[in-house]
From Swiss-Prot:
Its EC number is 2.3.1.286. Binds 1 zinc ion per subunit. It is found in: Cytoplasm. Pfam families: SIR2. The active site is at H125. Zn(2+) binds at C137, C140, C153, C156. Substrate binds at Y74, R77. Belongs to the sirtuin family. Class III subfamily. Its cofactor is Zn(2+). This is NAD-dependent protein deacylase.
């Protein structure tokens, strides 16, 4: 159960726990990026894409069947994300890492943490601006890919695909290992802007708590992670983190 403190006192209590910690794990979700104007996957698509469900486009099967359409959708997403800026929450998390040992684990693919100055970000779901080969001949080279929608290998015709984790795919092995290691060794697990509905990421706060960490949840709305938390702060991240992490 969360520690019994008033809503007004909760940020100060969180700050005290973080200051006393040697190792802090920060887990961020779509809510952090939403404060910068990045749509979440729960938001309805607009414009030319209004008739589609994002979960129907972000799959390997959809890409193999409609590669041009899905590639174009990701290109539009890249263009939109390129126009937004990191918000005060991103900046506060980056600043914390200049004076604390911080493992930053994110479910977001937009690269806003890196643009805010965070380094060594553990990207559980990949990166929107990266590409990788869907298949490959062993000689595929991104640098010499033939232009197209999508680009293809000049040797075998394999398609480039966005470097994100699609629905039904496993998390990157190294990123998942690093995230679990951070959960196992942190003193405080700060969970920001996630609904706690997407696994395996949603299991990390519980893993941290099982290993003795205090869990702090920051989210405007109640989430399933509130039951795991030692402290819950129902505020937007950009509002409370700058002072809480200063």
């Amino acid at each position: 159960m969360p520690t019994a403190v008033s809503d007004a006192a909760a940020p100060a209590q969180a700050r005290a726990w973080i200051e006393a910690a040697e190792r802090v794990m920060v887990l961020t979700g779509a809510g952090v990026s939403a404060e910068s104007g990045v749509p979440t996957f729960r938001d309805a698509l607009t414009g030319l894409w209004a008739r589609f469900n994002p979960e129907d486009l972000a799959t390997e099967a959809a890409y193999r069947e409609h590669p041009r359409m899905v590639w174009d959708w990701y290109q539009e997403r890249r263009a939109r994300v390129s126009q937004v800026q990191p918000n005060p929450a991103h900046l506060a998390i980056a600043a914390l890492a200049t004076r604390k040992t911080v493992a930053l684990v994110t479910q977001n693919v937009d690269g806003l943490h890196q643009r805010a100055g965070s380094v060594g970000v553990i990207e559980l779901h990949g990166n929107l601006f990266a590409n990788k080969w869907l298949d490959g001949c062993g000689k595929c080279d991104v640098a010499t890919a033939e232009p197209g929608r999508p680009p293809r290998c000049a040797a075998c015709g394999a398609m480039l695909r966005p470097g994100v984790v699609w629905f039904g795919e496993r998390l990157p092995v190294v990123a998942n290992y690093r995230a679990e290691e951070a959960a196992n060794t942190c003193d405080v697990c700060l969970v920001v802007g996630t609904s706690g509905m997407v696994y395996p990421a949603a299991g990390l706060p519980g893993l941290a708590k099982d290993h003795g960490a205090r869990v702090i949840v920051v989210n405007p709305e109640p989430s399933v992670l509130d039951e795991t938390a030692d402290l819950v702060i129902h505020q937007p991240a950009g509002v409370c983190l700058p002072a809480m992490l200063a």
